[in-house]
Amino acid sequence: MRIVLDASGGDHAPQATVAGAIAAARTWGDQIILVGDEASIRAELAKHDTSNLDLPVVNAPEMIEMTEHPAQAIRRKRNSSVAIGLRLVRDGEADAFVSAGHSGATMAGALFILGRIRGIERPCLVTHFPTVHGHALLLDSGATTDCKPEYLVQFAQMGNVYAQKIVNIAMPRIGLLANGEEANKGDKLVQDTHVLLQQRSDLTFIGNVEPKDMLINGSADVVVADGFVGNLVLKFGEGVFKMITTAASNNIKAEWRKNLVLGLLPALVALTLPGKGRWRALIAGLTGLTLPASMAVAPLLALRKRMDYRSHGGAPLLGVNGIAIVAHGKSDALAIQNAIGQARNAVEQRVVATISHALETVELVPSA
């Protein structure tokens, strides 16, 4: 398998991208094509043992800056890592593209270079959003911000197929993200989309879902929103999870220190006891005071792992005629490795062909 990685993309490139590519190549034995500034990539590769690994480097002399307009940058900078990488996929020289760089440029480039699946008006990003009961698929999480109701219905159709074929949910429950469960809640986009989704016999539409229901009740397997709202929910969720784990961690540390200090006096008293009794009393006293805080560490670590975006690596861009994974801009080596793993899974599961074939059997909603 041949995966193209934007080695110059991301806040921690090329250190994180090169390290992640090496880990992926060593784990799965795939060819990882590193596209970007050749000199910096090779300098980073030289720091690692890459023997028996297939890691070709393709030079991309142009860099798309985060301040640039995505569509204009893709058109002007044909020798950027994003443009070159996507052309490799389009031309059949690679199977998938992964980037933690300019997400807007990646999405615009995928749309211009790979093109859309026949009948699809706009692409969408699908994110595995953590919930109490597991995960819900949130789409769109940032690809198309200015939407028509017909776009959201197509997002629901693609999410339905993705959930069935990739996540193995036989009858995915589709929910429309809104500020209330009632059909008349939301802005005009949400209300008009609600009417269209109710008319779809190919979808198990359960109605509007509020963000709290998505997180706690697990009422929907697929949650549909326009890219602006979906991206806000995603980033707000990241902030909330970070706040919870950070606050809990700080409280545990403070409690542990307080109990340890309170345990010093009985410990000193224990040392005055005769024989082995002093050591038993000392251990029992300190353990009793520090154990409650220590016991909270394991659940906290489990929560952090469950909420960690690095475990999924990135978000697949659905609706384009090729596999493109948009990774988090702050991706470290582990996140890059998992994004590559997500790309190879999409290749193995034939995501594009599966969605395209499945949508041929249902009536797509054309844009008005």
UniProtKB/Swiss-Prot annotation:
This is Phosphate acyltransferase. Its main location: cytoplasm. Keywords: Cytoplasm, Lipid biosynthesis, Lipid metabolism, Phospholipid biosynthesis, Phospholipid metabolism, Transferase. Its EC number is 2.3.1.274. It is an enzyme of class 2 (transferase). It catalyses: a fatty acyl-[ACP] + phosphate = an acyl phosphate + holo-[ACP]. Belongs to the PlsX family. It comes from the Bacteria. The gene is plsX. Catalyzes the reversible formation of acyl-phosphate (acyl-PO(4)) from acyl-[acyl-carrier-protein] (acyl-ACP). This enzyme utilizes acyl-ACP as fatty acyl donor, but not acyl-CoA. It is found in: Cytoplasm. Transmembrane segments: none annotated. Gene3D superfamilies: Isopropylmalate Dehydrogenase. Pathway: Lipid metabolism; phospholipid metabolism. GO terms for biological process: fatty acid biosynthetic process; phospholipid biosynthetic process.
